[in-house]
Amino acid sequence: MGFKGTTVIAIKKNGKTVVAADGQVTFGHTVLKSNAIKIRKLLNGKILAGFAGSTSDAITLFEKFEEKIKAKGDGLVDIKRAAVDLAKDWRSDKILHKLEAMMLVADSKNILLISGTGDVVEPEEDVVSIGSGGNYAYSAALAYMENKKLSAFEVALRSLKIAARVCIYTNSNIVLEEIENE
């Protein structure tokens, strides 16, 4: 028995980047918490990150990712480089290799998915979603993205609400964070 499910989505639209997640934590067949926070602002709010999977593993990955960002020391933020460096460590480190989590990271220019196998994927669309309800949220977001009147915030919120209606491991206690694109 283990912790299961969540839904996290990242969207870029109309000069904004949003990362949003539901709040449900499930252990086996039991909902343990309905208002967990699964997204974080990093580097003084310049980067948004969200996770699906084991909470303790995700916190470890947040910390490692933030270390990779700060390691450069020149003040320039390159989430692609940091994500690749994290993925290299994830694949080669005996302890990190056992972590069971996925991450979405986004800044004003990029959205990246960092998988549990150490892959880094930059989606073709300005939408990506992970977790048990990820496919539902992703499909809904692709449809909502065609509506020019909807903001990134509205697309994320509506997409997660759809996922919550369909996925038993996703709820409608949604937390959203937003940054302005450069």
UniProtKB/Swiss-Prot annotation:
Ways its activity is controlled: Allosterically activated by HslU binding.
Coiled-coil intervals: none
Lineage top rank: taxon: Bacteria
Residues the record lists as binding Na(+): A164, C167, T170
Keywords, alphabetical: Allosteric enzyme, Cytoplasm, Hydrolase, Metal-binding, Protease, Sodium, Stress response, Threonine protease
Keyword Metal-binding attributed: yes
Transmembrane segments: none
Name of one Pfam family that matches: Proteasome
Catalytic activity as recorded in UniProt: ATP-dependent cleavage of peptide bonds with broad specificity
Subunit relationships: A double ring-shaped homohexamer of HslV is capped on each side by a ring-shaped HslU homohexamer. The assembly of the HslU/HslV complex is dependent on binding of ATP.
General function of this protein: Protease subunit of a proteasome-like degradation complex believed to be a general protein degrading machinery.
Family per similarity comment: Belongs to the peptidase T1B family. HslV subfamily.
Protein name, entry field: ATP-dependent protease subunit HslV
